[in-house]
Amino acid sequence: MFGNLFEEDYSSVSSSQYGRGKKLKTKGLEPPAPREFTNLSGIRNQGGTCYLSSLLQTLHFTPEFREALFSLGPEELGSLEDKDKPDAKVRIIPLQLQRLFAQLLLLDQEAASTIDLTDSFGWTNDEEMRQHDVQELNRILFSALETSLVGTSGHDLIHRLYHGTIVNQIVCKECKNISERQEDFLDLTVAVKNVSGLEDELCNMYVEEEIFDYDNLYHCGTCDRLVKAAKSAKLRKLPPFLTISLLRFNFDFVKCERYKDTSCYTFPLRINLKPFCEQSELDDMEYMYDLFSVIIHKGGCYGGHYHVYIKDVDHLGNWQCQEEISDTNVNVKAPQSEEEANDPLVVLKTILLQEEANQIPVDQLGQKLLKKTGISWNKKYRKQHGPLRKFLQLHPQIFLLSTDESTVSLLRNHLTQAPSDLQSCEQILHTLASESPGLNDDTSCPHWFDINDSKVHPIREKDITQQFQGKESAYMLFYRKATLQRPPEARANPRYRVPCHLLKEMDAANILLQMRRAECDSANSTFELHLHLGPHYRFFNGALHPAVSETESVWDLTFDKRKTLGDLRQSIFQLLECWEGDMVLSVAKRVPAGLHVYHTLDGDDLTLCEAEVADGEDIFVWNGVEVGGVQIQTGFDCEPLLLNILHLELSGEGSKCEQLVESPHVFPANAEVGAVFTALGTPAGAILMNSVESADGECWTAVPKEDMKKTFREQGLRNGSLILVQDSDSDNNSLLPKQGRWTNSMNELNWLQVKNFCQSESEEKQVQIAVTMHTVVFDIRIKAIKELKLMKELAENSCLRPIDRNGKLLCPVPDSSTLEEAEVKMGSSVGLCLGKAPTSSQLFLFFALGTDIHPGAEMDIIVEETLSVRDCLKIMLEKSGQQGEIWHLRKMDWCYEAGEPLCEEDATLKELMIRSGDTLLLTEGKLPPPGHLKMPIWWYQPARLSGHCESRDHLNCAFSQDSTWRAAPTQGAPGPEPAEVSLLYLGDMEISEEATLVELKSQALALPSVSKLAVQSTALLRVWTVESKRPSRLLRTNWRQLKEYRLGRRAELCLELLQKEEDLGPRDVLLRTQLRIPGERAYSLATDLIWDTTRGWTAGSLRQRVADFYSLPVEKIEIAKYFPEKFEWLPISSWNQQVAKRKKKKNQDTLQGGPYYLKDGDTIGIKNLLFDDNDDFSTIRDDIGKENQKRLALEKKKSREVHRAQSSDLFSNAGVPARFRGPEASLSIHVASFR
């Protein structure tokens, strides 16, 4: 069971470091959840496809449509395997619809996916993320199906089932001539405005006549003149399935805006269409139609949600409605059958006897019980007999569990049963099934379900009346002819008329799902426990601590949480072969003072889940009494608290000067506060408390003498709290900080400022609420709403959001938390905003477009923490109005800079440690495949650098006329005139991280812009990384792989063209040197200098190399490094190095470290002391640059102040501009031609 867990070397028990954080378990893709008790499958929402799900479920629960589609075989529709072949005519939409219906019927999953179907629609621009009208989809989908089925036996499927005919007639009052026009309809559109119900509107449309008279006469063709006439319409041909679309959306011409009509509009469960038909000689039943589907829209005209009420005609689902059961429907059975039905042993034996090989997984046994009897184990037996697995374990004489307890079977002596026994078993199951509410086939109680995307719930037929009116009301009605009867073999048979190839595919998929669920369940059932071995611990300083080392004291054990505490105890006994005496397992916890034991794990028959043992739990293994001879107190009450105590001590021996000393002390939480005097050896005095770690600016509270007997916990102290102890003869105020204040009550109230951000017309803009650190956020919010005189409705749709010092609204705080838990400081400001705070499973995220943003420009969104990065990106793109697929997400760091991209697009936000309040950046550009880099390539031409092959003017001729230099100012590069770092964008390049530097150069030379330069060799190119729009790091060693440079996913490179080949060694440093012009504050052209640092990075070595290069005496030159971002020069001399030597170690005598940080590409100024002995290295441009920096800093300061003021007054005006709504996207389905 445990593999090599118990071998002597204990290789499976890690000696991990004690006190580390919990590991993040990387979860694989979990299989979809099985169907719930209704045994019906929903459809997963792709982001905005609730309208599609509702219509597809309606078609699926139209058996005649479903079976007609199933009747079309691969010989007519083709095969999905051939869809990518150029000459194959594969009708993808009907094939995907067949597969979806088969999955909804047979695949054991909570919800099916429509991704394959929407892909067959040709949706490639995130159409599934947009909301559309279901009535429009109904017409477009049927049109697409008709086009897809051209040339097959199902070419008239839609026309045969859904098309009807309306005839419009005009009768001349003079000659009685009838002029008529016939038109087909797919659905009847009926008005809602000013109409009470469906039957009234049908009367208006197909019973009442419109009279042409007076000023509105009709021109009769027979009479050839204007005459009186009557116009009417009738239903000439009725389809088997009648679709009715309610026109709830209208346009207000006064306000010039759309609105939804939410007035009451009734419709019958059965309707007689005979009064509205042209022919009425048929039997009345031919005109009767029964309602079987109602698509419901919740929301307004600019957005909302669809779900559907559906009648299960074939009784495919498990429908339960306890209120419909009459008291007379009581099963009178033999007393023996009732007693046996109540015996779980008999029931479970019966189920196992009906299984193949009389064996079944334990997890599926409960599902079988629910399916066959209609009642779950927990509901009928758990209270008396305990959990199912435990019940099986307690009856080993009947049930045989596998070694891993995953499957169960009957023992051999229980397998042989007489026919009478088998018949009795069937009767028992029938008895239970008949007792189960809702499983009796009562035809008088139709089976209706509410299908809301993935979720399916049974409803009563009378619940339909609730959808007559309101924001959530009926939008489409579907009726079927009452004469349509279903064959008996279709009843409760989901396999009826499903093609054989789809049956095989679904059976194989179900087997695979079972295997995946078993594997996932096994993987999810193991967790890690940290075993703290009692003999390796000692008790001192108020808590438990490792006696030798944490490695020997703490072991990690991976264990199955479905096993019992007895199994865990036995496993630990086997691990610790030398253990003597009793073994007690207790839950422990790491606290600041050390390790503390809380409670003992009792009940060896309880599983770890039932004992509430969590993943990563710390388990203390000991004898339950003492550790190292010291008796241990356990429990929450005596939890050790680490307190910081301030008290006066003499500053030294014989000194009378006292100083305030802070020292940590550990006390049990249930100890009296007066124990502080004992710990300090002080007989008596005064105690002042501060609940935070710093005394600066906080409130000190004096403990009255009568409260000295109270415990630390009763006084509200916690880990890190400060206690100030004063002798009884000292001045009470002498030790208090200047900002502190003396308070005599523990319950003194502080204030919290609440600002109104609800865009209301309330006169009050902000209020102060009296609070303590233990006040609940919900109470503060409700009180603020009352004092701001806002509407009571805001209590259900508002939240509190802290405001930072820049006026930005932060993440909403949960209603259930206290101010202390929410980390809201006293005296701070919070905003009362519209919208609910995120739940514990949701994240509140900020996001913004691009990478160059400033605080306050972000949008916000609330998403589930289990959402994948890909889905989160789609939602953010939709909300920001962006289109396309070339986007990715980056997490912004604390200084508002774009961080690394979120590459694992299938990982959840929770797995990537995304937290509420984080800011994500929508960055344009597609992420490269794993193991590849995608980076911009620039052409770099240093300004006026001597020794280079071409000038910039010449290079401009080589590039196209459309290419322009992007000049990034160097902020004062040295020279007689303004200089700039010039970068020309060449294009993006994607390359493998396994490629070498020389391969990168070769691939860069293939870029169209570079090929015009006709560079003869890769050795004539230097490659630099680009940071802050300037070259940063020089890449050398041609045969080194790119991954060794650790470029990162945000790397940018630039190429520099050389006049001659060079091969820099690992110790060569490239410097730009400039000789200062005597008598002027300027420098000559820059020249490249290669410095070999083999002898060290010393100032003397660099000075010697410069002197040799310029043929000058080394004692007659002075050199300095230029810092362009500061417009400053720092002289490099051996004297500076000597100062550094005295302050630091000798091995730090290097120019690589501070204050020079010398690297490739740095500018070195050189001064010839024979002609210029002035100490100044600066230029006129440096003076100008410094002035500009001062001016920019002042402007930024003013800008921040203005922005802060604007943020605080953001909602001060009552008028809020109308929300901009983008153009609505059209809905379309792309179908190939099959004519």
UniProtKB/Swiss-Prot annotation:
It catalyses: Thiol-dependent hydrolysis of ester, thioester, amide, peptide and isopeptide bonds formed by the C-terminal Gly of ubiquitin (a 76-residue protein attached to proteins as an intracellular targeting signal). Belongs to the peptidase C19 family. The active site is at residues 50, 305. One of its GO terms (molecular function) is cysteine-type deubiquitinase activity. Residues 41-482 form the USP domain. InterPro entries: Papain-like_cys_pep_sf, Peptidase_C19, Peptidase_C19_UCH, USP_CS, USP_dom. This is Ubiquitin carboxyl-terminal hydrolase 40. The lineage of its organism: Eukaryota, Metazoa, Chordata, Craniata, Vertebrata. Keywords: Hydrolase, Protease, Thiol protease, Ubl conjugation pathway. GO terms for biological process: protein deubiquitination; proteolysis. Its EC number is 3.4.19.12. Pfam families: UCH (PF00443).
